[in-house]
C-alpha cells in the first residue's frame, strides 16, 4: 500500500499550487484525497459506472471533488484544468488508443498546465504476476513514455520509482515510471 500512496503523494507535490485538477482513471479513488487536499477543485473521471457511484458515496465528505463517467479516449470534460494526472491507466489501453488518450488529455489542459502519466515499466514486466501481465497490455519503457509525451509537450521530465522511492535514477532499472509534461506544443 505504501508504494501506491507514494505515487499519489508525488502527484500531489508536483501539482501543488494548481487550483483545478483532473484525475484520469480514478478507479476506487484510493489516493485521490491526498491530491484533493491542495486543490480548489478536482474532477475524477473513470469509465466504470460502479466505481464512480461507489466513490460518490464513499468520498462524499470531500467537498472539492466531483466524479464523472467519462472515457478520455472518446470525450473530454467541459472545462480545462491547471493539472492532470493519470496513474496506472495507460498500460490498460490498447496501444492504438495512445493518441486519443494524449490528445484528449491535452484538450482539457491549460496552456501552462502540467500533465503526469504514471505506468509500470516494461522492463519490470518479467517480474510481474500472471494477472498483471494479462491486464497490462500497453506497458511503456522510460524511452517510449518520454517519446509519447514529447509529441504533445515542450518539456518532459522523467522520474523513476522503486518501491516507494521516486527518483531520477537509471530508467531501465525502475519498477514504475512517471512522465511529467509541461508546456503544450502548439
Language-model features and meaning:
Residues 109-114:
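Short glycine-dipeptide loop
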Residues 1-85, 96-103, 108, 136-144, ...:
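Conserved N-terminal segment of class I S-adenosyl-L-methionine
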Residues 76, 93-94, 126, 149:
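Activation segment
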Residues 88-92:
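Short catalytic micro-motifs in class I SAM-dependent methyltransferases
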Residues 117-137:
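Short, glycine-/aromatic-enriched active-site segment of Class I SAM-dependent methyltransferases
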Amino acid at each position: 500500500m505504501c508504494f501506491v500512496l507514494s505515487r499519489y503523494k508525488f502527484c500531489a507535490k508536483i501539482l501543488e499550487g494548481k487550483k483545478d485538477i483532473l484525475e484520469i482513471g480514478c478507479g476506487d479513488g484510493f489516493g485521490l484525497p491526498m491530491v484533493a487536499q491542495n486543490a480548489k477543485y478536482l474532477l475524477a473521471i473513470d469509465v466504470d459506472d460502479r466505481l464512480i457511484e461507489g466513490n460518490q458515496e464513499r468520498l462524499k465528505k470531500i467537498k472539492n471533488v466531483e466524479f464523472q463517467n467519462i472515457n478520455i479516449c472518446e470525450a473530454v470534460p467541459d472545462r480545462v484544468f491547471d493539472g492532470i494526472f493519470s496513474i496506472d491507466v495507460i498500460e490498460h489501453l490498447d496501444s492504438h488508443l495512445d493518441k486519443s488518450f494524449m490528445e484528449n488529455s491535452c484538450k482539457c489542459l491549460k496552456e501552462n498546465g502540467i500533465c503526469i502519466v504514471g505506468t509500470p515499466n516494461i522492463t519490470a514486466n518479467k517480474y510481474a504476476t500472471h494477472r498483471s501481465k494479462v491486464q497490462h497490455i500497453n506497458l511503456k519503457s522510460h524511452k517510449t513514455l518520454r517519446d509519447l509525451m514529447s509529441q504533445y509537450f515542450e518539456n518532459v521530465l522523467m522520474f523513476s520509482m522503486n518501491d516507494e522511492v521516486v527518483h531520477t535514477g537509471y530508467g531501465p532499472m525502475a519498477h514504475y515510471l512517471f512522465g511529467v509534461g509541461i508546456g503544450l506544443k502548439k
